[in-house]
């Protein structure tokens, strides 16, 4: 059996993929992968996701420079969630310019921002458009 056949893909042919810092275990982001994205991730040793909004492969860092170098892939007990242990190049995983996409905490009935913006996202994406 092909290793990709062991995954319980959802009805859309996708599986949730959680990126974690390979040293600290901190959750950086969650995205989706289709079969091709997961296969390419394993081949290229970098995170490649499926963009549902754009309907195409999304090589993390292709626009921002914030590539996720793959250290390890893990599959959960139900074979329906992938974890990518990664090195986050540039220290920014979120398109908002933060280290993690999980920068809000629920406090007193509201979501509170608890993580700083490390770099203005307009500056991040403008830099890489001119390269």
UniProtKB/Swiss-Prot annotation:
Named cofactor requirement(s): Mg(2+); Zn(2+)
Annotated pathway: Amino-acid biosynthesis; L-histidine biosynthesis; L-histidine from 5-phospho-alpha-D-ribose 1-diphosphate: step 3/9
Keywords in alphabetical order: Amino-acid biosynthesis, Cytoplasm, Histidine biosynthesis, Hydrolase, Magnesium, Metal-binding, Zinc
Principal localisation: cytoplasm
Quaternary context: Homodimer.
Role: Catalyzes the hydrolysis of the adenine ring of phosphoribosyl-AMP.
Keyword set includes Cell inner membrane: no
PANTHER family with a match to the protein in the record: HISTIDINE BIOSYNTHESIS BIFUNCTIONAL PROTEIN (PTHR42945), HISTIDINE BIOSYNTHESIS BIFUNCTIONAL PROTEIN HIS7 (PTHR42945:SF1)
Gene Ontology MF term list: magnesium ion binding; phosphoribosyl-AMP cyclohydrolase activity; zinc ion binding
GO CC aspect terms: cytoplasm
Protein name per UniProt: Phosphoribosyl-AMP cyclohydrolase
Taxonomic superkingdom: Bacteria
Residues annotated to bind Zn(2+): 77, 94, 101
Family from the record: Belongs to the PRA-CH family.
Lineage: Bacteria, Pseudomonadati, Pseudomonadota, Gammaproteobacteria, Pseudomonadales
Enzyme Commission numbers on file: 3.5.4.19
SUPFAM superfamilies: HisI-like (SSF141734)
One Pfam family it belongs to: PRA-CH
């Amino acid at each position: 059996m092909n290793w990709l056949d062991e995954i319980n893909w959802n009805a859309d042919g996708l599986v949730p993929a959680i990126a974690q810092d390979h040293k600290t275990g901190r959750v950086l982001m969650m995205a989706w992968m289709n079969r091709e994205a997961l296969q390419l991730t394993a081949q290229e040793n970098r995170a490649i996701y499926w963009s549902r909004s754009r309907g195409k492969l999304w090589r993390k860092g292709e626009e921002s420079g914030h590539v996720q170098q793959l250290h390890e892939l893990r599959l959960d007990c139900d074979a329906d969630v992938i974890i990518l242990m990664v090195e986050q190049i540039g220290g920014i995983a979120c398109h908002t310019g933060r280290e993690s996409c999980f920068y809000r905490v629920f406090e007193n009935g509201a979501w509170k921002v608890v993580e700083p913006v490390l770099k203005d996202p307009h500056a991040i994406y403008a830099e890489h458009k001119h390269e």
